[in-house]
Swiss-Prot record:
GO molecular function: hydrolase activity
Alphabetized UniProt keyword annotations: Hydrolase, Virulence
Species of origin: Eupenicillium brefeldianum (Penicillium brefeldianum)
Protein name (record): Thiohydrolase
Family of the protein in this entry: Belongs to the polyketide transferase af380 family.
Length: 308
């Protein structure tokens, strides 16, 4: 982004309705105005992808809050790496409540942003919390259920784990990705060689709090979540969906089907030549960043952003 001196990011924390402390970074704008709430993807931490996104919003004079989801990174919650999507939906609302207390933020202009798994979380949060002005969903996942032949096995293992925990044993954890780039619970979270390399080595490449594992119960919670049903309540909340043309983790045609099913007002942008993990990088990202900032700052009720 063009160079101009910006306020340094601030370490912040806020409380959730159920008493957890979530911690992250605030990137203050130069002047009072809109703000955006950003969380990383499935089992990811704030050092992965999203701090650069926050900086791009800050360059456009939009205050950005990035935080580690509950049980991850610097945020509270036990057991660790226990992914609870519905709780994460609720946490977006608590983050919005926190931002409303900051003098730099226009209380009437706070938006939600998510990528991949967190794009679904952000869409659900915006559907249920009408205080959110709009929602930006980047490469949302479209398959949240295990493969049919694996579903009975996954549920059986979840029940065995529940019985084990009741008598005092620690929660069972499994890798997010195997060496073959597959999710061991059969969820639609796959990766090619480059994507696998990034994810398993993120801990050693700037994200020391990242762990390539989740609790087994995370998948029970994922199966109990019905994100696509909740999205029908998005009516009157503006949505911008960014669809990477070459996405192999969440295929572009399936993202388009998801977009087509959303209520108006909505806007889709196809990121040409981009995949799931590089959609937010490259020389052309500045154009995409400006599009997103325009969407957040644009007039109420208008769902269009400038074309890249």
């Amino acid at each position: 982004m063009p160079g101009r001196e910006l306020a340094p990011r601030q370490n912040v924390e806020f409380q959730t309705l159920d008493g957890l402390t979530l911690r992250g970074w605030l990137f203050p704008a130069q002047s009072r105005g809109p703000a955006v709430i950003i969380t990383p993807g499935f089992n990811c931490v704030k050092e992965m992808f999203v701090s650069e996104v926050a900086e791009s919003f800050q360059h456009s004079d939009v205050t950005a809050l990035v935080y580690d989801p509950r049980t991850l990174g610097d945020s509270g919650g036990l057991p660790r790496n226990n992914i609870d999507p519905l709780a994460q939906v609720s946490d977006y609302s608590d983050a919005l409540t926190f931002l409303k207390t900051l003098p730099i933020v226009d209380q009437t202009n706070i938006s939600f942003w998510g990528m991949s798994f967190s794009a679904l979380v952000a869409l659900n949060a915006a559907a249920l919390d009408k205080r959110a002005r709009c929602c930006i969903a980047v490469c949302p996942l479209t398959g949240m259920q295990p493969e049919p032949d694996m579903l009975p096995k996954v549920l059986a293992r979840c029940m065995q784990d529940r019985e084990s925990q009741v008598v005092g044993n620690p929660p069972v954890t499994i890798s997010v990705l195997t060496e073959q780039g597959r999710n061991p619970a059969g969820m639609g979270i796959g990766a090619d060689k480059m994507e696998y390399d990034y994810m398993v080595n993120a801990k050693f490449r700037g994200a020391p709090n990242y762990e390539n594992r989740t609790t087994l119960q995370s998948y029970y919670k994922m199966m109990a979540w019905q994100p696509f049903e909740i999205m029908k309540y998005l009516s009157k909340t503006r949505v911008l969906m960014i669809i990477p043309e070459n996405d192999t983790i969440s295929p572009a045609d399936k993202q388009q089907v998801l977009f087509d099913g959303l209520p108006e007002p909505k806007t889709a942008h196809i990121a040409k030549g981009k995949g799931h993990l590089d959609v937010l990088s490259g020389a052309d990202y500045e154009i995409l960043a400006e599009m997103q900032a325009y969407f957040i700052k644009g007039p109420r009720g208008k769902g269009n952003a400038p074309s890249a």
